[in-house]
Amino acid sequence: RVTTRIDMWKHAVTGEDFPVDAPDTVTASGLLKNGAEVGYQVASVPYNASGTCLEIYGRKGTIVLRSNSFNIGPSQVYLAKGNKKMEEVTPASEYILIPNEMAAGPGINVGQAYARFASAGEPGYTDTPDFDHAVVRHKLIEAMERSHNEGKVIHLD
């Protein structure tokens, strides 16, 4: 479902209200091939946004990723096994691709992206999205648009 919930925004500089008609909320739910249920909501809110949160609930526990902005960071990762208390965890060193001395902030994500890009040319490296990955994503986006426009569930192969 794609909707426009907020039809007036305040100008960041002048403070004046102005009308908007762009969609600001996308919600979706689905069932993956492996049987896992998926539900998500993406919303652009004008005030006091709580940031971004990704929660994954599995048979053995829960993992949560929180950030004011995933694309800028920093992000915090929390893990709870079974019914134990949620605790912040540090990603394993194998996932940190940039030097420790690199300054904190948005540059970290850019550095990580460049490190992955550089590794993409190495023999046997398979962690790089390709055209086939893009086609899958575009089929999903198209199915979401069709579902919204037609008001029905769209099944993907």
Spans of features found by a protein language model:
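C-terminal glycine/acidic-rich active-site capping loop/insertion
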Residues: V2-L32, E55, R59-D132
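Glycine-rich phosphate/pyrophosphate-binding beta-alpha loops
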Residues: Q41-S50, G105
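C-terminal hydrophobic helical "lid"/dimerization subdomain
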Residues: A134-R146
